[in-house]
């Protein structure tokens, strides 16, 4: 920070007391971030131009110019809202006399109320002090001296418009045979849209595949039933033929074995036992032994076995009757 020279006693002290109506301290505004009022950025813009006729009273303004830091120029955007014209226009040499001395000390505290620019807007805070020359990106460029008579203009610029979110591209239409996926839903939509979409797709798929007519379904079912019935009839016929063949063979064997009468009904098991004993009896007559254990039975024993088998079969028939 630059060193401020100390004022010497003499005419300077008298002039300062007269011009400022007493000793006052010049306060520097603190740094505060710029605020937004109803979505608009507010900032101060200095449109003052230096006047060559402005002469400091007894060197006071020259010293004020030396003590004021040099701010960096800011690019000026195109104003949107109309700015309030400065009050009182430009100052003349006569108006800068003793009557405007109180305004010299309070020049840095002046700002317009936003109520005059737009109703309902809050009063903007004072702008932060400009950055020092060592941190200024634009280099040490001198700004014209600010006249205390001229007042800054407050411009309102609309906030930058946000880009609208682009809609997602529609998925390509798949063939009707495949299942159609549900379209991507936005966060605000409910789950009922996806459910209705799935139901609608299923309805379209079912309508795309034609159903069988009632007449065709009846004809197909009747054909199936007829085929099954034919197969059952063929199986029954084969079983019947087998049973009839076996029954005929046992009947022929029964006629060859001895029995009480030819009209006597014998079971297949009884017919087989009588036939075995009858064969053993005939073998004993020929002096042959066909027995399983080679017991060498006599002819009378073989006849008794046949008799016992016929009697047991007769008793069984009587019990059944």
From Swiss-Prot:
From start to end residue, where is composition biased (Basic and acidic residues)?
93-109
- Composition bias of kind Pro residues appears in 70-85, 121-132, 160-186
Q: Name one GO cellular component term.
A: chromatin
Quaternary arrangement and interactors, per the entry? Answer: Efficient DNA binding requires dimerization with another bHLH protein. Interacts with NEUROG3 and NEUROD1. Interacts with ZFPM2; mediates indirect interaction with GATA4. Forms a heterodimer with TCF3; repress transcription of TCF3 and TCF3/NEUROG3 dimer-induced transactivation of E box-dependent promoters.
Q: Which residues form a coiled coil?
A: none
Question: Which InterPro entries does this entry report, sorted A to Z?
Answer: ATOH8_bHLH, bHLH_dom, bHLH_transcription_factors, HLH_DNA-bd_sf
Could you tell me what this protein is called? Transcription factor ATOH8
The record's listing under Gene3D superfamilies reads:
Helix-loop-helix DNA-binding domain (4.10.280.10)
Disordered: annotated segments: 59-193, 203-222
A GO biological process of this protein is: negative regulation of endothelial cell proliferation
- Please report a single Pfam family linked to this protein: HLH
Its gene is ATOH8
* Organism name: Homo sapiens
Residue stretches making up the bHLH domain:
230-282
Q: What does this protein do?
A: Transcription factor that binds a palindromic (canonical) core consensus DNA sequence 5'-CANNTG- 3' known as an E-box element, possibly as a heterodimer with other bHLH proteins. Regulates endothelial cell proliferation, migration and tube-like structures formation. Modulates endothelial cell differentiation through NOS3. May be implicated in specification and differentiation of neuronal cell lineages in the brain. May participate in kidney development and may be involved in podocyte differentiation.
Q: Which domain of life is it from?
A: Eukaryota
